[in-house]
Amino acid sequence: MTKITVVGAGSWGTALAMVLADNGHDVRIWGNRSELMDEMNTKHENSRYLPGITLPSTIVAYSSLEEALVDVNTVLLVVPTKAYRDVLQEMKEIVTEPITWIHASKGIEPGTSKRISEVIEEEIPENLIKDVVVLSGPSHAEEVGLRQATTVTSAAKRMEAAEEVQDLFMNSYFRVYTNPDIVGVELGGALKNIIALAAGITDGLGLGDNAKAALMTRGLTEIARLGRKMGGNPLTFAGLTGMGDLIVTCTSVHSRNWRAGNMLGKGHSLEEVLESMGMVVEGVRTTKAAHELAEKMEVEMPITAALYDVLFNGNNVKDAVGSLMGRVRKHEVEAIPDLL
């Protein structure tokens, strides 16, 4: 039995805590809302982020990070990307032994454009790190909470570490594959949020299935193009953390990025969208980070650039569609050398 603390009591952190508890592990979860932690301990529900789901009674919730981390050998980080450094800086003052650091957040750090595993390795002293592992894939928290069949990927530089995390989570409804490509797995999970925002805009504008299919396909090309430039394996983007996550995030009403894009497509301002969502929309920050990376690394990402102009330069969504459709004609196969 592994002693594991889930850091972050949002919908995804709560759902993953359920998986771990179902597997018989000693599971604690930390959140900064004391009233929510009290509810999880007494009513076994997270009514704010995962309403209507009864949590295993063995999950113990803490509002004190120090108490939550006593004697643990594994932590699972599921917090917004912008909060990582603050949380990690607090954790490194508490942890005293090398432990496994798993993260299940899909985003790129604002300001630095770093992957989350890079942030962990920068902030946590080497003597406190046993392994850093990424857990990612097509996985809505609402469905995992209902114990519906879900498949994800565990990625680490050391394959034994990825397999250990695979064993932690795997059960009859939660299947886990392994992948040594930590760069590709992280980037696929983060960058698909950009395309999900654009897919929501497409649906909000009522552009139809043809346009959405083209957007998703060309969007995957952009993801793989940047991913390869950053050291990812192109084949990773055809797997669960690339195409798989892209499909589920671009087509489901559970996707907050799709919902945000849908509102933008229907004429709402970004400020109105973010205020109404009530939860983090990682795709907004990731669009900015990816656009900056693309310019720095000289990678062509026209969909990302068009969305960046909508979100941060006030461009009209219909004009953005027109600019993409009016680009210089090209051979589709021109993308292939970037992928192989």
Curated annotation (Swiss-Prot):
Q: Which GO terms describe its molecular function?
A: glycerol-3-phosphate dehydrogenase [NAD(P)+] activity; NAD binding
Source domain of life is: Bacteria
Q: Which GO terms describe its biological process?
A: carbohydrate metabolic process; glycerol-3-phosphate biosynthetic process; glycerol-3-phosphate catabolic process; glycerophospholipid metabolic process; phospholipid biosynthetic process
| Catalysed reaction, written as an equation | sn-glycerol 3-phosphate + NAD(+) = dihydroxyacetone phosphate + NADH + H(+); sn-glycerol 3-phosphate + NADP(+) = dihydroxyacetone phosphate + NADPH + H(+)
Q: Which InterPro entries match?
A: 6-PGluconate_DH-like_C_sf (IPR008927), 6PGD_dom2 (IPR013328), G3P_DH_NAD-dep (IPR006168), G3P_DH_NAD-dep_C (IPR006109), G3P_DH_NAD-dep_N (IPR011128), NAD(P)-bd_dom_sf (IPR036291)
Instruction: Please name the HAMAP family in this protein's record.
Output: NAD_Glyc3P_dehydrog
Similarity annotation: Belongs to the NAD-dependent glycerol-3-phosphate dehydrogenase family.
Organism from which the protein derives: Bacillus cereus (strain G9842)
Write down what this protein is called.
Answer: Glycerol-3-phosphate dehydrogenase [NAD(P)+]
| Record has Transmembrane helix as a keyword | no
What is this enzyme's EC? 1.1.1.94
> Quick one: which pathway?
Membrane lipid metabolism; glycerophospholipid metabolism
